[in-house]
Design a protein with these regions (language model features):
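Terminal, charged accessory segments of proteins
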Residues: 1-187, 341-365
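Catalytic core segments in nucleotide and nucleic-acid processing enzymes
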Residues: 192-365
Length: 365
């Protein structure tokens, strides 16, 4: 695990979130990884990407067969292009024009990694000491071309058993580049980036904790055009609000993670509107699965000066029980986890216990 300067809690939390999201960061590649020279979120991403790229290159960059067309060679290889050989008058030089397939690491997926590293090298928000590691990583990509990060076709990337080790690294690169572009355009702040990262961690935690033989945990995508009062950066950085649904044979819990921003704190009616909106989605979910449905809004506080110690609160909205709780992005994960567990305990666990009691009474009769 990384060595850390105690005073930089933001970087510690961000690193721990990334470790939770990407198992590779907890592996041997990062055994000697240190955070003591990292002071910004951009530097953290740069340090992780460069270490990851270096480790990948040491194992051997992924190669594919690349078509080399109309190459002038001294000995025949692949398909000989007779017409082109005559046109170029290669006979006098003792050569032939050939087209052939060659196994090469100079391919698009490696171009993306090199392009990302080059971008980080010239990023003014990355610490100079971190750039030393970026330069070392770039040296591992000699002989590989690069692509302009503004022209990357992410959907063109195809994964198979041989290049699956790239998947999470490419995903991290895309997230980092998209967020930094949004920051430059004034759409996103570092605190909001932490919120986005935290939201991903919360979703993964619910899936890993409660997806078992008793419960099914799934992600429910709700397009933002169907949501009200969403922060502007949410609308511009993603297409949908990804709710978590925990469901068993008796009931279901629909969890919506939202940002606790200044607008929410100033407008006393906004929290109620969020709850009523969640009721609408609970009703749709009930119509689909025919089970009793509860809802819970998990607000994420990004204000370092405030700490939320209040327990979960629950209110009835149109015959639906809707909970509300607040977690702090800069708090220790242990305390965050306890609050998330309360969401499950109050709704799913309590409903299960109630059903068991009813069944026991019936069996005694």
């Amino acid at each position: 695990m990384a060595v850390l300067k105690k005073q930089n809690r933001e970087i510690e939390n961000a690193f721990n979130m990334l470790c939770y999201l990407y198992d590779e960061i907890k592996g041997r590649k990062f055994k000697t990884f240190t955070l003591d020279v990292i002071n910004t979120l951009d530097s953290l991403y740069a340090a992780i990407v460069s270490r990851w790229c270096t480790a990948l290159a040491k194992q051997g960059l992924y190669k594919e067969y690349v078509v080399q067309e109309n190459e002038e060679l001294t000995s025949p290889k692949g398909q000989i292009n007779i017409q082109e050989s005559i046109t170029r008058q290669t006979r006098s030089r003792g050569t032939l024009i050939c087209s052939y397939d060659e196994l090469s690491e100079d391919i698009y997926i490696n171009h993306i990694l090199k392009g990302t590293l080059q971008y980080l090298l010239f990023n003014s928000n990355v610490d100079e000491k971190v750039k030393v590691e970026v330069k070392k990583a770039l040296q591992m990509f000699n002989g590989v071309g690069y692509v302009d990060i503004n022209l990357i076709h992410w959907k063109a990337i195809k994964y198979n058993n041989n290049n699956m080790a790239y998947k999470h690294l490419i995903e991290l690169c895309k997230t980092m580049l998209d967020e930094q572009k949004a920051c430059k355009n004034g759409i996103l702040t570092d605190d909001q980036r932490m919120y986005i990262l935290f939201k991903k961690q919360i979703r993964k935690w619910f899936i890993e904790t409660y997806n078992d033989e008793d419960n099914t945990v799934e992600i429910v995508d709700v397009p933002y055009e169907r949501m009200e009062d969403e922060p502007e950066f949410e609308l511009k950085t993603s297409k949908s609000q990804r709710m978590v649904a925990i469901r068993n044979d008796r009931c279901a819990l629909l969890i919506c993670v939202r940002l606790q921003d200044e607008k929410l704190q100033k407008d006393n009616t906004l929290g109620r509107r969020h709850a009523e909106e969640l009721v609408r989605h609970c009703r749709e979910y009930k119509d689909t699965y025919r089970v009793k449905v509860f809802g819970c809004v998990v607000y994420v506080n990004i204000d370092k000066k405030k700490l939320n110690l209040q327990p979960i609160t629950v209110n009835a909205f149109n015959d639906y029980m809707i909970g509300e709780t607040t977690v702090d992005v800069y708090d220790q994960w242990l305390f965050v986890e306890n609050k998330l567990k309360d969401c499950y305990k109050y709704f799913i666990e309590r409903e299960n216990n109630r059903a068991h009691k009813v069944n026991n009474k019936k069996s005694k009769k």
